[in-house]
UniProtKB/Swiss-Prot annotation:
Potential odorant receptor. One of its GO terms (cellular component) is membrane. It is a multi-pass membrane protein. It comes from Mus musculus. It is found in: Cell membrane. Keywords: Cell membrane, Disulfide bond, G-protein coupled receptor, Glycoprotein, Membrane, Olfaction, Receptor, Sensory transduction, Transducer, Transmembrane, Transmembrane helix. GO terms for biological process: G protein-coupled receptor signaling pathway; sensory perception of smell. Glycans are attached at residue 8. The chain crosses the membrane at residues 29-49, 58-78, 103-123, 137-157, 200-220, 241-261, 275-295. The gene is Or5p60. Residues 50-57, 124-136, 221-240, 296-321 are cytoplasmic. This is Olfactory receptor 5P60.
């Protein structure tokens, strides 16, 4: 039942997600592509986590943060992708009011967590390049755990504000969301209550997370750039810069798409463009992060080769004996 009658009001109990397209052929094509992307996302990030756990060579702060970023990527993609895949297979995809709240809150949690972890990783690179002699002290195990716990708390607070904002909205009219997940903008358009408080709270929370993390990243890389430019050795410059390239790529992709959706005026892009960009930063980027961090990282590639070599060697011994 999509509507619940309560006195003079009719409350919406479920929403209809329109998804990406109505074309049946395109739905099958997109289902196949996004399913493959999701499987690569989960397997790639899980492989990253396991490789970091089992490789003693990767037991460093940078990889500790990377393993949590991989976990956040799995959660972020999983908050919307399974429901999107179902949308491709059914004629009309519905999501309950509570389900919509959970989806919106989980996306806000993992999105906020990803922002904080990217900022923490930038700070880690700053300490490693600008204060290498104090690195072991400033990035001790206790400090690393505190930074990660703080990131999870930040993500939880962002999700709490988002969920409370959603629960303050009242829906009594149309229940069709022109999106593939419960995003805030289309929900605001459907609400028949005063949305000013919800918009203010959500904007404050998301804006604070974004501005705070961008500030940390910008300051960290400003000092990193100054330090690199002061280096006399060309080899030292190249080595220092190469350690930051992967992280800068991930930051640029993630914050670039967020800026397109939430900062640019809506008059400059259509709803369909919004959907495409949302797919990119919620589905594609979580798949790309393991590739970005591993392809240019010799330590990860070396650890992977060692473990694959051990596995192949052990299997050959079993076959031999």
């Amino acid at each position: 039942m999509a509507f619940l009658h309560n006195g003079n009001h009719t409350a919406v109990t479920e929403f209809i997600l329109l998804g990406l397209t109505d074309d049946p052929v395109l739905r099958i094509v997109l289902f196949t592509i996004i399913l493959c992307i999701y499987l690569v996302t989960v397997s790639g990030n899980l492989s990253t986590i396991l490789l970091i756990r089992v490789s003693s060579q990767l037991h460093h702060p940078m990889y500790f943060f990377l393993s949590h970023l991989a976990s956040a990527d799995i959660g972020y993609s999983s908050s919307v992708t399974p429901n999107m895949l179902v949308n491709f297979l059914v004629k009309q995809n519905t999501i309950s009011y509570i389900g919509c709240s959970i989806q919106f809150g989980s996306a806000a949690f993992f999105g906020g967590l990803e922002c904080f972890l990217l900022a923490v990783m930038a700070y880690d690179r700053f300490v490693a390049i600008c204060n290498p002699l104090l690195y072991s002290t400033k990035m001790s195990t206790q400090v690393c755990v505190q930074l990660v716990v703080g990131s999870y708390i930040g993500g939880f607070l962002n999700a709490s504000f988002a969920t409370v904002s959603f629960l303050f909205l009242f829906f009594c009219g149309p229940n069709i969301i022109n999106h593939f997940f419960c995003d805030f903008a289309p929900l605001i358009e459907l609400s028949c209550s005063d949305v000013r408080i919800s918009v203010l709270v959500t904007s404050f929370s998301a804006g604070t997370v974004t501005m705070l993390t961008v500030l940390v990243i910008a300051i960290s890389y400003t000092y990193i750039l100054i330090t690199i430019l002061k280096m006399r050795s060309t080899e030292g410059r190249h080595k220092a810069f190469s350690t930051c390239t992967s992280h800068l790529t991930a930051v640029s992709l993630f914050y670039g798409t967020i800026t397109f959706i939430y900062v640019m005026p809506k008059s400059r892009y259509s709803t369909d463009q919004n959907k495409v960009v949302s797919v990119f930063y919620m589905v594609v980027i979580p798949m790309l992060n393991p590739l970005i961090y591993s392809l240019r990282n010799n330590e990860i590639k070396g650890a992977l080769r060692r473990h694959l070599g051990k596995k192949i060697f052990s299997q050959s011994n079993i076959l031999f004996y």
